[in-house]
Amino acid sequence: MKDIELVYKGEIHRIPNRWDAMNDRQYIRLVGDFLRMAAGELSAGEVRINWLCDIMGWSKRKFHSEEQIANLVAISEQLTFMFQINYPDNNSVLDGVDEDTYELCRRIDPYRLNIPLARVLRRLDYQYVIDLCFCAQLIPSVQIGERSYPGYRIETSFGTLTCSLTALQYVEAQGLIERGEESLPLLAAILYYPEKDYNSERAHELANDFAKLPLETLTAISFNFQAFNNYLFSKTLFSLLSKFAHKPKQPITTDASDALYDLSKEGLGNAKQIEQMNVLTYLKVLRKKTIDAVKDMKGFGWDKLKISEEVGLPISVIDKIL
């Protein structure tokens, strides 16, 4: 998504239209508005306007006339990075449209669209959902009392993705994503673990300290990790690991914690060494295991249907591997 450019009094003003343009304060404040939206206190439009004013340093109180307010709303509606629009039946109404139209309909409210399909979309029960898919660490550290806890690092410089999480940190954090509000302090303690070698028991102890953080901060930490997790499995070569249609019998284990210790059984290191393995190395190993297993089965003379049933991958994915 492109940033927004405005020309005002001969000067060009650029408005960021992306997650990674925020500092930690702006991001946590946005998440606070997401929580208010979930509670029915704010609309999606109000969330966008609040963020626009915050990121640009504008005061909403200075927008008085109808024209000023209309301009503010019009600019805010160009901010498409934070929400997607979900239509019933997994967006089935958009089946068959071209990619550009699909993206437009998922980002722009149907009442603001000027295409024939918009009339159909307006009659449907659609919902705004937060689009959590980005590759950035928006909360580099958190302060609890007198102590600062640095978070995991994500780097994308020079066209290469790196992340400081260990395999065990990642697996444990991933397992907490759907656990709800009560698990947020533990999730934060795992992701902001302060010592070089990650230790699960110590992270559980630290969760009591992280419980002192505001709900907005804890939720922001969770959202950031979810976004990175979604990015890994939709925008990188690791997307292959998200294609399993069902849990295979053998030889691939798709459960993250089981797969972690299966690597130890295969001689890639003892359990401790596997736990401390870098998460991206861990995912590369799982991806290679998946590809090798499919190719081995093909070498045994298995047809694609049998491979699909055994491995759990759709035939279309198996075609790409082979």
Mark where each language-model region is.
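An amphipathic, hydrophobic-aromatic interaction surface with interspersed Lys/Arg
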Residues: 1-300, 305, 310-322
